[in-house]
């Protein structure tokens, strides 16, 4: 197994004249297949930096039962996923190929996504083949980038970071030159025709009633059923990302350009975060609409906090997060419980569950054992996913999976892929769902999906006017 050794070089710049968005606009045409990750709203010390990643060096993708390594010397390896060689083996083997030394090497790692479809590798879950060939993408894709631009949002500093092999000449000056460029190309965005869905309102309500029936029969306690929408467009979808981040600031803002397709969104929910030997899950369970009236929103938040159905769901999903972490952690506890958090169109109830990885535990396996989030599947999780695969007329693709960072040192920070667009060949796919329990009401659950999609639909309208 060949190992690739790198060292980091870096320089720090004053960042008060540069934002992540303006900088990305300057560098994206020079460095295609780049990524932007920001944080806003309810972020603290664990999430206070923004990143731009440029120039892919290597990648690991998993699709059709095979892990594909694309390596810095342009070589390619294929490794079938089997019971003896699982996804965590592939990710760990790929990470082990790279050794990075130097200051800020902790930022060097794999940036990308795990789609909901990846559940097929972790449990006995059938996944429908895509009926839209243009929406095909690997089940998992993570990229190691040569350059990182790191924004310290508290200090107004920019860090430029480059990974170099022995004998390689630095080109960090070219990155800095691009950042200082005052001109960049602007493109329009325009939606074409109406938004469509494979499901009508009545068909989705019928699905909800089927979910309620499964809860009443005792097949599941809760099941999360979703609905997909599609919108044709022309122009620059980055303008849509800008509109979405303005309308719906969230802890996880991201725009990934993977070449043939892009994934971008504004997610409020941490799927899993591992720092050192500490792991965290932040389940969101409980949603109500914002009205724009502060007094009414406060009343809605109090009703949400006290509603027996919402509380029962929240307790169930906090317990599921505890169980997920307990598979690889000890000292599992609830750090905060049922905190009310306000977003542009909705109010959420949020808790945090944490644990300490056992000495023998593998961080990647711990991450996989939490996938997918209970808040996007249900409880019991495996049975809920089996029913989701049967009831939803399409596979979920990126929706309900996760997106973010896997460090070469075993750290990771992954957001749940919700409030998100997938863009390919002039079509946007976006999706939302809600947790169904025995006492659910089909009309209310339909409205909850519409509430969650409110920010995305408003962003489309706003992007056309920018």
Model-derived segments and spans:
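Extended alpha-helical targeting/anchoring segments
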Residues: 1-466
């Amino acid at each position: 197994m060949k190992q690739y050794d790198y060292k980091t070089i870096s320089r720090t710049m004053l960042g008060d004249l540069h934002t992540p968005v303006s900088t990305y606009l300057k560098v994206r045409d020079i460095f295609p297949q780049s990524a932007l990750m920001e944080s806003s709203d309810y972020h603290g010390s664990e999430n206070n930096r923004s990143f731009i990643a440029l120039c892919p060096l290597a990648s690991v993708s998993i699709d059709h039962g095979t892990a594909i390594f694309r390596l810095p010397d342009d070589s390619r390896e294929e490794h079938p996923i089997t019971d003896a060689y699982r996804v965590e083996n592939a990710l760990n083997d790929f990470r082990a190929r790279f050794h990075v030394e130097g200051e800020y090497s902790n930022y060097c790692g794999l940036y990308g996504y795990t789609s909901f479809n990846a559940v097929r590798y972790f449990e006995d879950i059938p996944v429908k083949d895509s009926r839209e060939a243009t929406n095909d993408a690997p089940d998992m894709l993570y990229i190691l980038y040569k350059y990182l631009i790191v924004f310290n949002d508290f200090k107004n500093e920019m860090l430029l970071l480059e990974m170099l092999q022995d004998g390689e000449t630095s080109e960090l000056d070219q990155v800095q030159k691009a950042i200082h460029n005052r001109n960049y190309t602007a493109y329009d965005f325009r939606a074409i025709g109406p938004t469509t869905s494979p499901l009508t309102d009545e068909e989705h309500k019928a699905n909800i009633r089927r979910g309620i029936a499964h809860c009443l029969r005792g097949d599941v306690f809760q099941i999360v059923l979703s609905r997909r929408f599609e919108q044709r467009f022309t122009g620059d979808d980055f303008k849509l990302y800008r509109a979405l981040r303005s309308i719906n600031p969230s802890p996880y803002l991201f725009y990934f350009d993977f070449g043939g397709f892009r994934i971008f969104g504004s997610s409020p929910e941490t799927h899993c975060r591992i720092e050192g030997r500490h792991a965290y899950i932040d389940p969101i369970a409980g949603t109500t609409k914002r009205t724009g009236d502060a007094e009414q929103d406060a009343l809605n938040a109090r009703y949400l906090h006290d509603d027996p159905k919402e509380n029962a769901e929240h307790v169930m999903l906090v317990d599921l997060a505890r169980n997920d972490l307990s598979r690889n952690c000890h000292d599992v506890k609830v750090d905060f419980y049922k905190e009310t958090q306000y977003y542009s169109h909705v109010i959420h109830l949020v808790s945090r569950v944490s644990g300490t990885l056992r000495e023998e535990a593998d961080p990647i396996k711990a991450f996989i054992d939490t996938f997918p989030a209970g808040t996007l599947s249900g409880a019991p999780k495996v049975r809920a996913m089996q029913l989701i695969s049967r009831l939803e007329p399409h596979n979920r693709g990126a929706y309900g999976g996760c997106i973010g960072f896997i460090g070469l040192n075993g750290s990771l920070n992954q957001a749940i892929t919700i409030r998100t667009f997938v863009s390919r060949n002039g079509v946007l796919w976006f999706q939302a769902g809600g947790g169904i329990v025995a006492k659910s009401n089909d009309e209310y659950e339909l409205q909850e999906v519409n509430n969650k999609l409110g920010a995305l639909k408003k962003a489309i309208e706003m992007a056309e006017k920018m």
